[in-house]
């Protein structure tokens, strides 16, 4: 069995209790290299086999999972944040489906919620915004035209924008082109 576990925002104590327990029980952990706090690996048992996936291909990750599953081992695939938001787990799950290997997901604390908590903020304020848009700028992965920053900014909702810190000047310009004012509060 493979468990996809969200590692949370980076602080080792922000992993979910379920995620921590899965790490403690794991026979094999495959973690996302520099993206996952290495302190989380301290939850692993003494005999746990640990693999850093930073330099592994998808095929190599799947091969580790396949061999461990054949041996009846419990596998944790440890991803940063919450793997359901920009976690790139679908291709792994598709391969596991093809191989007939069972898997489950254990959510993690997503960066947008960790950031709000660390700043004592909330995204939904009566009379201001009752919606939260989670999106990103174009990068290696294209964004559908109908999901442009400008089109989302037109809603004047709260936004959590991922994977875009290298594009801040362009992001600010596009948010204002979509309707946000220059004095709109923002947190990086």
Which residues fall in each region the model found?
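Short secondary-structure boundary/capping segments
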Residues: 20, 42, 67, 123-125, ...
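A contiguous loop/helix-start segment that scaffolds small-molecule binding in enzyme catalytic cores
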Residues: 2, 60, 70-75, 131, ...
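Class I S-adenosyl-L-methionine
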Residues: 1-109, 114
